[in-house]
Amino acid sequence: MTQMDDAKNGIITEEMKIVAEKEKIDIEKLRKLIAKGYVVILKNVNRDTNPVGIGQSLRTKVNANIGTSPDCVDIELEIKKAKIAEKYGADAVMDLSTGGNLEEIRKAIMDAVKIPIGTVPIYEVGKLAREKYGRVIDMNEDLMFKVIEKQAKEGVDFMTLHCGITKQSVERLKRSGRIMGVVSRGGAFLTAYILYHNEENPLYKNFDYLLDILKEHDVTISLGDGMRPGCLADNTDRAQIEELITLGELVERCREKGVQCMVEGPGHIPINYIETNIRLQKSLCKNAPFYVLGPIVTDIAPGYDHITAAIGGALAGYYGADFLCYVTPSEHLRLPTIEDVKEGVIATKIAAQAADVAKGNKLAWEKETEMAYARKNHDWEKQFELAIDKEKARKMREEIPSKEEKACSICGDYCALLMVEELGKR
C-alpha cells in the first residue's frame, strides 16, 4: 500500500500525521489532498526517512542536487555537501552522481542524512551500458528496469524518470528550430536511444510495469522534463509543451495505480512567461505537485545563477510551483563546491519563503512577524535564531560593531528605532 492508496481508503498514516504537524494543516484535509494526487509524501518504505510533504496548501519545498562526475569522484566531499544542504534547510537531496561506484556513493549519502533522497536512475543505466557495451546508447530495457528496481529496494524516496520523451516528441523536437536542442542529461540519453534504435522510449512503452515497481516500495515518481528549454530563447516551445501534454496523461495513470507522482518543469524562463508555465502545468497535469529547476530568468549571469534562479523561484512558487530545485553559483561552469551548495540552498530558501509569504502561508508569516518584533525590541539573539543563515548574520554584526549596543553600525547613535523610542518615553 502506498500513501495514496491509504489516503483513498480513508486511512491516516504515521507519515501523514508527521507532515500535518510540521505544516500545521488539518489531517483530514491533508489526507484528501494526497488521495487526489495534489500532495505527495516523499518516503520509501525501505528507508528511515523524515517524511516530507510537497504540494497544494503546504509550504514551498527546496531540493539540492549533489553528486560526482567523471572528472571529480570524492565520496567524502559529496557526504559533506549532503550534510551542509540539510543543515541550511534543504527539504530533499538528489544524488546525480555519474562518476565512481554509484551504488556506494548513493548508500553513503542516504546514510549521512535523514531528509528524502532522489535519483535519476537513467544515469546509472547509461554508466553501466557504457562499461558493459561501450556506449550509453547500447543500454536496453532489461538494464533500465533492473537499475530502477535495485534503487527502489535500496530506499530511494523519489526518482526522476523521463517517461514523456517519445518517438513523436523527438520528431517534433527535430522540427522545432530550437537553438540548444536537448539539455537534460537523462533526456539526452533517451532521445539518443530513440534516434539510434528507432524504438519507443522503454519507460513510456512499459509505463504500467514501471509503476508496479515504484508502487511496491512507495517511490514517488518525478516525471522528468527531458524536453525542457536550455535557454530563454527556447522557452515554452512546441517540444516542451508536447512533452507536458504527455506527462499530464501519465499523471492520470499514476493516480489510477495509486502511485504518488509530481511533474518537473523548466528551467530557463523569462519572468513574463513564468505564470504561463505554472498555469499550463497545473491545468494539463491536474494539479500534480510541480517541481521546477530555478527557473533561471536570464542567461547572461554565469557565476550568479543562484540569484537568477532565486528570482524565478520566488515568482514560480507564488504562482503555484510546489518544489524548487536549487541552482548554485557554479551552474553551467563546474561541479559545485560545499560553499556553492550552501549558497544555492540559502538563495532558494529565500525564494521559497518569499513565495510562501505572498501566498499567505501562516507559518511563513509567523516568522516574518517574529522577526519584526525582534528588530523592534533590538533582540539580536532572536534575529540570529530566525535568520535563514544564522552564522553569517552573527558574523557580519560582529565584524563592524556599533558603540550603541542596541543598534548596528549602519546608524549607531542615529538609529531610527531608538530615536523614536526615546521620544515616546517622554
UniProtKB/Swiss-Prot annotation:
[4Fe-4S] cluster binds at residues 408, 411, 415. InterPro entries: ThiC, ThiC/Bza_core_dom, ThiC/BzaA/B. It is an enzyme of class 4 (lyase). Pathway: Cofactor biosynthesis; thiamine diphosphate biosynthesis. The lineage of its organism: Archaea, Methanobacteriati, Methanobacteriota, Methanomada group, Methanococci. It comes from the Archaea. Signal peptide: none annotated. One of its GO terms (biological process) is thiamine diphosphate biosynthetic process. Its EC number is 4.1.99.17. One of its GO terms (molecular function) is carbon-carbon lyase activity. It catalyses: 5-amino-1-(5-phospho-beta-D-ribosyl)imidazole + S-adenosyl-L-methionine = 4-amino-2-methyl-5-(phosphooxymethyl)pyrimidine + CO + 5'-deoxyadenosine + formate + L-methionine + 3 H(+). Belongs to the ThiC family. Its cofactor is [4Fe-4S] cluster. It comes from Methanocaldococcus jannaschii (strain ATCC 43067 / DSM 2661 / JAL-1 / JCM 10045 / NBRC 100440). The keyword Oxidoreductase does not apply. Binds 1 [4Fe-4S] cluster per subunit. The cluster is coordinated with 3 cysteines and an exchangeable S-adenosyl-L-methionine. This is Phosphomethylpyrimidine synthase. PANTHER family: PHOSPHOMETHYLPYRIMIDINE SYNTHASE, CHLOROPLASTIC, THIAMINE BIOSYNTHESIS PROTEIN THIC. Substrate binds at residues 65, 94, 123, 162, 184-186, 225-228, 264, 291. Keywords: 4Fe-4S, Iron, Iron-sulfur, Lyase, Metal-binding, S-adenosyl-L-methionine, Thiamine biosynthesis, Zinc.
